[in-house]
From Swiss-Prot:
A lipid is attached at C21 (S-diacylglycerol cysteine). It is found in: Cell outer membrane. The lineage of its organism: Bacteria, Pseudomonadati, Pseudomonadota, Gammaproteobacteria, Enterobacterales. Residues 1-20 form the signal peptide. A lipid is attached at C21 (N-palmitoyl cysteine). Its main location: membrane. It comes from Erwinia amylovora (Fire blight bacteria). This is Amylovoran export outer membrane protein AmsH.
Amino acid sequence: MIIIKTKLIPLMVSAALLSGCTIVPGNHLSTMGKDVVEQQDSDFDIDKYVNIFPLTPSLVERMKPKPVVAQANATLQRELQNYEYRIGVGDVLMVTVWDHPELTTPAGQYRSASDTGNWVHSDGTIFYPYIGRVRVAGHTVQETRDEIASRLSKYVESPQVDVNVASFKSQKTYVTGEVTTSGQQAITNVPLTILDAINAAGGLTATADWRNVVLTHDGREQPVSLQALMQNGDLSQNHLLYPGDILYVPRNDDLKVFVMGEVKQQATLKMDRSGMTLSEALGSAQGMDQSVADATGVFVIRPVKGANRSKIANIYQLNTKDAAAMVMGTEFRLEPYDIVYVTSTPLTRWNRVISQLVPTISGVYDATRNVQTIHKW
């Protein structure tokens, strides 16, 4: 029996070596014995669904975002020039009739004008002595002044009437999300723009995504770039706010970049307000692992968006065999959900297989020595 076992030793060694083809580092999930739901395109060829672009200086230059330049906003200027506040339900008016103090309720030492003024009732009217109810909701201050003066003229000769809004309570806009103080802001006789509202809210927080702000007006959403407005002076991004408008500043949680492969620390990185370049992403991952990384295989995998896409990803390859090529990495700007992947060298992959084989080979070797020892006995 010992002789037969000895003859099996070469077969055992060969089997161990051949099994190296399947001994690969990392996790494994077998589909054997599981219910696999077949799809129409289950046998798709991934190579047909991606584009690969070697990064060159000319390509990097073409892909640079176009610089945003300062520009005026003629539409906003017209709106500001023609702006007139219209009185609404809940506002408090202060009506003064000169030389007729009996028609003016003075604000006392401990009472403000908003406490003693004329409140606009739910039916849109105020009550005023002699002339009764006056409809003011939807009217401007000038229109209200003329209406009261006209009706008072039956009782007062040439009345000099002044009307002001003592308290603006009827109309509001809302600033929400990543601002220092979110909440409602009153629409007043001073026009309120996006920039005014952000400043009144105390500015943006450190986690704000200032590129993808959303303005909701009349049920429709409009994208706003506060980066273009506040950093580059693009006034086309500034809009006049109207009652009921909602200005939402999102968090930057969706501005993620994934760094994987042969880097010293794989990571999910958040892009800050200034964005992120390929070199910055690699630096944040503590750089490539020089002992195992393939310098010719630095890839940026970028998902292709859109319903009618024919490709699922564009892949950009940076060859850093010459470290001078890293300068292109400083110019290549990443986008949210880009995957930065650094491949390993062929030798590294082989060494990993060998490292898995060594325990098996050692075990076979020890078994062989033991059999030989027994045989000698």
